[in-house]
């Protein structure tokens, strides 16, 4: 048993040995009494106090020792830390190709993170309760020997409240026993077979293989967080003092090591994964196919045969350290290797949470006060991460170019770094002497090239002269530059103090002030929508162009393949044509790749464009290098023989100039740069590059930011402070967003882009809806899950028929999900994951494509994990049977790197395959949306269907593939449908609604037309694709019921059902709500008052009751009932509607329930029994028997119509609650609606039907001036009375009519009522309302 006092330094504590009692059997009953006594608050009293005192005196020494141990244990448990909820995982963010050259790619190891927002006081109280229970529960129930080791009578006497405290000796101190040196540095477990030593030179600490309260074992957690990779076992363990290393090559990277068994010998051989275990072996007795990693990727722990897991008892007795404390302890160890848990509990200034971002701000000063600390915190965090990354023991080959600069070429591993190194980055090289470790030489250079074999070329001004030094004596470190943060902070300062930085409207719009109306710009709209080298714009693009050109602030949402680059180029061309004077257009994107692509397109349509690059990227190859500013300066310099050319030649010849010549050279170069910029029509730069001092002399009233959703809001602020008067943001917030490294900054809300915040403020984005990239079958799922079914394909199946002979399971649907069951493993860096099974299948698929004639450039491989990317690249080149150069030409990249790009065929490797650890950031719907929309002709997904299906979104995707018969397994030559049974996903939001990528709780509901592709709706939402208006008309023709008349009157009531879906068999409960609340005589109440409650589009995956059952329920409500029987009906009606699903199966259960109540409720229950039996009939049969009766019943007396009309006119709500279209037409609408109700009751009369149509048309004419309403699935209209105060709503009820049993519900007219916001009980109540 282990007990610890964490208030002591260096894992000090108490080691309590168990002493077996000689009389365990005889003392069991007494032991249970003692435990019960403790649980009852120490109220136990023995009958023989005198004997207990004698026993206490006789066993004084034993009792003192036991009591002291108990006191120390209590003190220890009081200092234990609370075990918070560990379900949250820390999502690691991966950047794209570059984000100001500071992107992160390879640290994608999901480590659990505790909630930082937990209340400290509540945590302390919960911790005390946990510690109390831990001692009296775990310490006594799990280790009974602690009590049995003492005389049980002395224990009873110890608990006697009559004993004097002096006899117990509670305060007598006892010397503490130090823990052994091999105790776990986290939890202090020190069982020899369960601990491992970290062999990093700066560490040397011991850690156990237990998890405690974390998801990874303590040794794995330490290795990952500290980036250490070498371990050794304890000298007294079963395997001795062994440093784990590869038997062949001596590799000590524990994340690469695994084991195999010899066929003829009873031995286990340790081999590294690559290259020893992946290549052929010379040892014939080794079974290379049996290789398994030493670290179980799913469990994140060492194999139990090598390092045992602490027992449950030992785990419960150990220090209960949380992941937050571990992370802080690792940070302290970087500064002080001897730091303890006591040190991390000291308050620190950086523990305070920064202020969260807001939707709107009072002024620019408040904006700056909130955002600036977040920028500084992100910069500090990035600086610490970059400067902590390094690689030692590298070998360098030196060369010298014609520019007199030196180039150092050396291999490096991308997966070993947390950041993606790209050309233009700065690195520092150091030469470490072989004796003493002294730095004898260092220099900083910039990366100029990285090839596919991970050979990096670094250009420096000098080279190391210590050629005699041994190989592997060089060290590489990353260099952090503050340029980005400095420019962002400068832009925020300008936003606050410079009035001329941007227009007044944009100032207030960015702050979220709604009072300033936009003033339309005087720009002539285009008449010709076709430009040279650009395709003709489609309807959605033309509509977006016309609205954007005259607006000072506009948003364009471009889903994948909809032509964002095309429309951006057209808008820029038109702005250049109509800008006044010397004004120029500034075009920005957050990444260099995106801005290069847009620069090339602008050059193709004939614009004078200049690409402004940073100084660090001037020597980096670019597809638009001829358009860059420094290359244009170089060309002009070569064409002439001026002073600048002479100085440049001198600098190239001698490597440097004198101080005077250098100043003159810089001045002449700057003057030429200004001349080129003045002649340009468009200047292109990254968002951070827009803050370049060379642009400070220019003003840019027209600014377009492409891919704006990938930039943080402060990053977009840099170009806007250049005199902006018109801003156009282009992007898609349902794809990947900004990349931030600091979790505190992300939690504070800075990860929300400016594009998203403006949508939340009510700015309506213009969505492009026609895509030109993907095969129609590939468009289906992304359209329905991310874009509400609006994304339609302009291409047909024949347009995307590649004529390939690849064995697709369904040739008409070129896609399939290949079910892989291989386990995931931790990558060589320890910060990522790999899946060797998926990599092997990927190589076979690539080989098949190449054999069938596909080119390497047509194939792209996407994986979310850097470790898998590196392993697939290496595995294809080693295992592929075709030419090596073919595999080298195939691009393997992360999801983030592929955003904005496309390939003919995409292979997606999901990697994650475990039972307990989850799927990490694969569950991000935006990342999945990007991965699924990169392919033009075919898509292949490799993953574990059973594991992935636990996530709701992935479950929908795999179900979609399964419904199309493309969920397969087996060999490529014989693919067959997989029989895998999908897991039941966790229900989201309590409504079964799929998440909308990039949309949060305050997302804006777009007012747009709905384009229904009529595909995939059954799979995604569990509802059919039939239009609600068509179904309503069909139902009205068949049943002629008043509820159908309400649906038939949708033109009168102006229902917006663009997004509506309806099903006769199984639909969601939210889509089956009555389209109008009715009174007992069958008239539509809300049509008299013209109150409309539009609800946002919503779908539900839960199946609900059929229309047939709702129709029966409605008919039951309309049956004439005696007044004395109203009360029983009120009691039973809510029960009847509690479970509308599967109505035909529930009838026998309800019938049994009514039969049991029949004995107690005689005549009243007998009548209800008959009504229940009538519901079993089909709607048309019931209609045939009750048609005449219903027609008479639904006839409303003319007197009541007049009274009702007068009453409604006298009780109209205030003007501010009315829509403008109702102000002048209330009386006409009431008369028309009354005529409609009368005409609909005589459905067989053609004249009345014609009158009804005329009335509909007249009402539509009266409403022609009404604004558009947002699309809804169905409109739930409630008949309510509204006073001047919204809180004083009163429901109107007619005293002459019988009341419905369910309570009435009233809501303000200005509110939107969403079906997804209703609980099941409220939904049932709304269905049965009666006025």
From Swiss-Prot:
Species this protein is from: Dictyostelium discoideum (Social amoeba)
Annotated stretches, region: CC/SHH/C:
198-228
Per the record, the domain of life is: Eukaryota
Pfam families on file:
AAA_11 (PF13086), AAA_12 (PF13087), UPF1_1B_dom (PF18141), UPF1_Zn_bind (PF09416)
For this entry, the protein name equals Regulator of nonsense transcripts 1
Ranges of compositional bias, category Polar residues = 1092-1111, 1258-1268, 1284-1310
Q: What does this protein do?
A: RNA-dependent helicase required for nonsense-mediated decay (NMD) of aberrant mRNAs containing premature stop codons and modulates the expression level of normal mRNAs. The formation of a surveillance complex is believed to activate NMD.
The residue stretches assigned to a coiled coil in this entry are 54-131, 1149-1178
For this protein, the record's InterPro entries field holds: DNA2/NAM7-like, DNA2/NAM7-like_C, DNA2/NAM7_AAA_11, P-loop_NTPase, SF1_C_Upf1, UPF1_1B_dom, UPF1_CH/ZBD
Task: Write out the residues that bind Zn(2+) 3.
Answer: 246, 249, 272, 276
**Where is the region Disordered?**
1-129, 1032-1150, 1180-1310
GO process annotations (BP): nuclear-transcribed mRNA catabolic process, nonsense-mediated decay
Say yes or no: keyword Membrane present: no
Q: Which gene encodes it?
A: upf1
Q: Write down any Gene Ontology CC term.
A: cytoplasm
Q: Which EC number(s) does the record attach to this protein?
A: 3.6.4.12, 3.6.4.13
The record's listing under PROSITE patterns reads: UPF1_CH_RICH
Q: Where in the cell is it found?
A: Cytoplasm
State a single Gene Ontology molecular function.
Answer: RNA helicase activity
Q: Does the keyword rRNA-binding apply?
A: no
What protein family is recorded? Belongs to the DNA2/NAM7 helicase family.
Where are the annotated segments for C4? 246-276
Sites binding Zn(2+) 1 sit at: 184, 187, 208, 218
């Amino acid at each position: 048993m282990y007990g610890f006092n964490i208030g002591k330094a260096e894992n000090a504590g108490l080691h309590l040995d168990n002493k077996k009692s000689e009389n365990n059997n005889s003392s069991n009953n007494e032991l249970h009494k003692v435990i019960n006594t403790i649980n009852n608050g120490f109220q136990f009293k023995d009958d023989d106090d005198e004997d207990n005192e004698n026993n206490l005196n006789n066993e004084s020494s034993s009792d003192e020792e036991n009591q002291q141990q108990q006191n120390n244990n209590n003190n220890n448990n009081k200092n234990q830390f609370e075990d918070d909820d560990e379900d949250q995982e820390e999502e690691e963010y991966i950047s794209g190709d570059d984000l100001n050259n500071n992107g992160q790619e390879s640290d994608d190891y999901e480590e659990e993170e505790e909630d930082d927002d937990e209340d400290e006081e509540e945590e302390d109280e919960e911790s005390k309760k946990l510690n109390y229970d831990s001692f009296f529960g775990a310490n006594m129930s799990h280790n009974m020997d602690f009590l049995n080791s003492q005389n049980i009578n002395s224990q009873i006497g110890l608990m006697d409240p009559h004993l004097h405290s002096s006899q117990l000796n509670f305060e007598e101190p006892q010397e503490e026993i130090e823990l052994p040196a091999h105790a776990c540095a986290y939890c202090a477990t020190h069982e020899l077979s369960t601990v491992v030593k970290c062999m990093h030179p700066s560490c040397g600490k011991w850690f156990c293989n237990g998890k405690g309260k974390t998801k990874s074992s303590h040794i794995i957690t330490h290795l990952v967080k500290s980036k250490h990779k070498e371990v050794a076992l304890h000298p007294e363990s079963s395997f001795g003092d062994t440093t784990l290393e590869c038997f062949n090559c001596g590799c000590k990277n524990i994340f690469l090591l695994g084991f195999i068994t010899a066929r003829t010998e009873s031995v286990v051989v340790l081999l590294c994964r690559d290259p020893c275990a992946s290549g052929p072996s010379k040892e014939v007795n080794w079974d290379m196919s049996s290789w398994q990693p030493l670290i179980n990727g799913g469990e994140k722990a060492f194999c139990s045969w090598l390092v045992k897991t602490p027992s449950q008892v030992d785990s419960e007795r150990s220090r209960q350290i949380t992941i937050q404390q571990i992370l802080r302890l690792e940070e302290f160890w970087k500064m002080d290797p001897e730091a303890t848990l006591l040190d991390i509990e000291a308050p620190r200034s950086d523990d305070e949470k920064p202020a969260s971002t807001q939707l709107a701000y009072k002024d620019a000063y408040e904006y700056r006060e909130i955002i600036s600390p977040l920028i500084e915190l992100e910069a500090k965090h990035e600086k610490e991460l970059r400067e902590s990354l390094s690689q030692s023991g590298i070998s360098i080959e030196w060369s010298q170019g014609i520019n007199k600069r030196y180039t150092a070429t050396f291999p490096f591993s991308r997966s070993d770094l947390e950041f993606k190194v790209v050309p233009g980055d700065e690195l520092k090289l150091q030469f470490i002497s072989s004796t003493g470790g002294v730095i004898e030489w260092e220099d900083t250079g910039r990366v100029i090239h990285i090839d596919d074999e991970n050979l990096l070329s670094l250009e420096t001004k000098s080279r190391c002269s210590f050629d005699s030094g041994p190989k592997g004596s060089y060290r590489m470190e990353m260099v952090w530059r503050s340029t980005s943060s400095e420019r962002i902070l400068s832009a925020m300062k300008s936003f606050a103090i410079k009035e001329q930085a941007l227009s007044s409207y944009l100032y207030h719009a960015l702050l979220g002030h709604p009072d300033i109306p936009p003033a339309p710009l005087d720009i002539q709209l285009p008449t010709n929508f076709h430009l040279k080298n650009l395709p003709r714009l489609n309807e959605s693009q033309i509509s977006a162009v016309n609205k954007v050109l005259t607006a000072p602030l506009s948003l364009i949402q471009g889903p994948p393949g909809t032509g964002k680059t095309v429309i951006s180029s057209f808008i820029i061309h038109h702005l250049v044509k109509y800008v006044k004077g010397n004004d120029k257009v500034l075009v920005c994107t957050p990444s260099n790749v995106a801005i290069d692509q847009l620069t090339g397109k602008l050059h193709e349509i004939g614009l004078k464009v200049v690409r402004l690059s940073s100084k660090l990227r001037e020597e980096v190859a670019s597809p638009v290098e001829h358009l860059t500013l420094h290359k244009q300066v170089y060309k002009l310099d070569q064409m002439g023989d001026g002073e600048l050319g002479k100085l440049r030649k001198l600098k190239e010849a001698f490597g440097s100039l004198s101080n005077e010549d250098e100043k003159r050279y810089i001045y002449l170069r700057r003057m030429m740069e200004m001349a080129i910029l003045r002649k340009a029509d468009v200047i292109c730069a990254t968002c951070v590059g827009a803050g370049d001092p060379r642009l400070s002399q220019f003003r840019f009233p027209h600014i377009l930011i492409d891919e704006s959703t990938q930039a943080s809001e402060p990053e977009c602020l840099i170009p806007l402070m250049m005199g902006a008067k018109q801003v156009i943001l282009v992007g898609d917030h349902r794809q990947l967003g900004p990349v931030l490294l600091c979790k505190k900054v992300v939690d504070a809300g800075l990860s929300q882009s400016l594009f998203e915040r403006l949508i939340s403020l009510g700015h309506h984005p213009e969505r492009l809806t026609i895509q030109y990239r993907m095969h129609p079958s590939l468009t289906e799922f992304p359209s329905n899950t991310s874009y509400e079914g609006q994304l339609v394909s302009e291409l047909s199946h024949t347009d995307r028929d590649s004529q390939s002979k690849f064995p697709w399971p369904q040739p008409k649907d070129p896609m399939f999900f290949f079910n892989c069951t291989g386990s995931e493993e931790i990558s060589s860096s320890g910060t990522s994951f790999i899946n060797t099974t998926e990599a092997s299948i990927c190589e076979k698929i690539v080989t098949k494509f190449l054999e069938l004639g596909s080119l390497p450039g047509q194939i792209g491989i996407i994986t979310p994990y850097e470790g898998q990317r590196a392993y697939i690249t290496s595995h294809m080149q080693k295992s592929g049977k075709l030419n090596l150069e073919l595999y080298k030409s195939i691009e393997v990249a992360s999801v983030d790197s592929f955003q904005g790009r496309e390939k003919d065929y995409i292979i997606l490797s999901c990697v994650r395959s475990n039972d307990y650890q989850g799927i990490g950031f694969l569950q991000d719907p935006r990342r999945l949306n990007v991965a699924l929309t990169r392919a033009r002709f075919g898509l292949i997904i490799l993953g574990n269907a059973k594991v992935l299906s636990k996530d709701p979104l992935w479950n929908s995707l795999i179900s979609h593939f399964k419904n199309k018969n493309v969920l397969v397994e087996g060999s490529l030559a014989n693919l067959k449908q997989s029989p895998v049974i999908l897991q039941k996903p966790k229900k989201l939001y309590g409504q079964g609604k799929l998440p909308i990528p990039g949309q949060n709780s305050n997302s804006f509901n777009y007012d747009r037309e709905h384009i229904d592709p009529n595909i995939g709706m059954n799979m995604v939402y569990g509802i059919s694709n039939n239009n609600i208006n068509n179904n309503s008309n069909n139902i009205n023709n068949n049943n002629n019921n008043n509820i159908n008349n309400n649906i038939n009157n949708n033109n009168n009531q102006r229902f917006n059902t663009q997004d509506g879906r309806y099903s006769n068999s199984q639909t969601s409960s939210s889509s089956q709500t009555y389209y109008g609340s009715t009174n007992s005589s069958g008239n539509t109440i809300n049509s008299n008052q013209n109150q409309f409650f539009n609800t946002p589009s919503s779908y539900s995956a839960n199946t609900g009751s059929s229309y047939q059952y709702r129709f029966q329920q409605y008919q039951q409500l309309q049956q004439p009932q005696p007044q004395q029987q109203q009360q029983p009906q009120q009691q039973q009606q809510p029960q009847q509607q509690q479970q509308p699903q599967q109505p035909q199966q529930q009838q026998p259960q309800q019938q049994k329930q009514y039969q049991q109540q029949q004995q107690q409720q005689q005549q009243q229950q007998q009548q209800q029994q008959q009504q229940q039996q009538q519901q079993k009939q089909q709607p048309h049969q019931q209609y045939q028997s009750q048609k005449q009766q219903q027609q008479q019943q639904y006839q409303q007396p003319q007197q009541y119509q007049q009274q009702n009309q007068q009453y409604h006119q006298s009780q109209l709500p205030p003007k501010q609650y009315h829509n403008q279209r109702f102000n002048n037409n209330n009386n006409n609408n009431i008369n028309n609606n009354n005529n409609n109700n009368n005409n609909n009751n005589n459905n067989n009369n053609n004249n009345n039907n014609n009158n009804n149509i005329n009335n509909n048309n007249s009402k539509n004419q009266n409403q022609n001036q009404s604004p558009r309403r947002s699309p809804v699935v169905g409109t739930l209209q409630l008949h309510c009375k509204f006073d001047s105060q919204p809180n004083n709503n009163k429901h109107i009820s007619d005293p002459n009519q019988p009341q419905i049993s369910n309570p009435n519900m009233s809501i303000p007219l200005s509110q939107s009522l969403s079906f997804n916001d209703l609980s099941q009980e409220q939904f049932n109540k709304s269905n049965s309302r009666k006025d």
